[in-house]
Amino acid sequence: PANDYLLKKFFRIPLDENVSRSRINAILFYYTAWYADNGGEVTEANDYDAVGIWSLPGQHLPATLSDDPKFNKIFFDDLDKRKYEVLPPSMGYYYLFMIGKDLSQPNVRGSVRTILNHYKERADRDNCAVVLEAISEHAKSVYEYFGFRICLTFKFGEKEVNSQGILDPEGEGFTGHLMIYHKDGEKVLRL
């Protein structure tokens, strides 16, 4: 639900507009191509069982602002501010825009691990960080397992949707976590 909410916001689609799974998939394909066209990397593991969309140190794509100032403040102003408070000056970082696993193949395991480990190894070699936002508690626990540290916990979608993404003017929205990995995180990240 949180991913669909975010895609609607990024594409300026009203939250009350019906959006089919085909249209959500088209938005995902658009972002995949946009990242690939603009110097990002699209990586896969286990014959596309998992796919990750990344930007590279010094080559981050411009923000795709929504038409919602409150959302933009959270996702672009607040998260960027905290990221730069935590990272040492001039430290580069890999940014995980999105990662997905083919849930129709539950017997295929280790795909997300393969992708995350590849970028952690690159970051270690380059003395860079890896930055991402976990938009579910499950994702947060997976990233913590891989050594990511929570830098900021934030709410989004409050008073717009409930935790299932259903419109609700009193809804609690979603909880996200800005997370950063660095091989020497205990020493260099300013948490």
Language model features with spans:
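Glycine-rich acyl-CoA binding loop
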Residues: 107-119, 123
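Active-site rim helix/loop that mediates acceptor-substrate recognition in acyltransferases
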Residues: 14-41, 53-55
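Conserved acyl-donor/pantetheine-binding loop and adjacent beta-alpha core of acyl/acetyltransferases
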Residues: 34-107, 122, 155-172, 185-191
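Conserved beta-strand-loop-alpha-helix junction that forms the acyl-donor binding cleft
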Residues: 97-104, 131-140
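Conserved beta strand-loop-helix elements of the APE1-like EEP
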Residues: 179-184
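Short hydrophobic/aromatic beta-strand or adjacent loop that forms the aromatic wall/cage
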Residues: 173-178
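Helix-loop element at the rim of GNAT/NAT acetyltransferase active sites that forms part
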Residues: 1-18
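Conserved active-site alpha-helix within GNAT-family acetyltransferase domains
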Residues: 122-127, 136-160
